[in-house]
Amino acid sequence: MKILGINASPRGSKSQTLRLVKTVLNGARSRDCEEEFVDLCKLNIEYCEACGVCYKSGKCRKKDDFQSLYRRMLSADGLVMGSPTYFRLVSAQMKTLFDRMADAVHCQLLTGKYTVNVATSGGLHNDREVTKYLNGIMLTFGSYVTGSTGTSVALGSGAMDAVEKKAFRLGKKLAEDIRVRRVYLRQERIHKENSAYFRQLVEMNKDEWIHEYDFWSRQKR
């Protein structure tokens, strides 16, 4: 079982978000998972230009670090997504990554994967808005969400210590979810609704979105 952790904080080794992402990975490793860590802000990932090439070919025309990271995300069994809170949302680096993954949404390419989402904030409880956003995004990609956690760093070291304990437990739970292929029924209903919707959307645009239409044509109804 392989789990990929992505930290979207630009603060390097000083990042509290990095600390949480690695704690989740440590929890997963304690359950015999192979883990990999990516510092997103060290990569060169350009903005999406809505050109639609990925809909037609399944590949992005930009020659940057996105394709390599995307392949690693698709090959992982589980993901740990971490972001600081910037004005009640994820960091620009995380949002840019998501914007480049439109093909993954249309084709529900994270189906069968499991995710833990973590966030930190300077404002009181704003991390909850970010974890809620991350949970929704990963569901939309087709992933199950094992859980999420976060904290306001201004609450002090005690709050961070407490959330680290939860993050470690979530890492263990993530490994177990992958191992037993756990089905979350409410999330599964959302996945089925999204799959039906995006299949219909792609079929409506089949003459333009050639790659995505070919993908859905191979999937069972």
Task: Outline where the language-model segments fall.
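N-terminal beta1-alpha1-beta2 submodule of the flavodoxin-like/Rossmannoid cofactor-binding fold
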Residues: M1-S83, R88-D103, K165-R221
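Short histidine/acidic/glycine/proline-rich micro-motifs that form metal-
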Residues: P10-G12, Y86-F87, T120-H125, S152-S157
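Short, well-ordered secondary-structure micro-motifs
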Residues: C48, R128, G158-A159
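Residue-level signal for alpha-helical context at structural boundaries
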Residues: F66-L69, G112-V116, Y133, S152, ...
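Short, glycine-/small-residue-rich phosphate/pyrophosphate-handling segment
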Residues: A92, H106, L110-T151
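Active-site/pore-lining binding-face segments in mid-to-C-terminal subdomains
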Residues: N135-R189
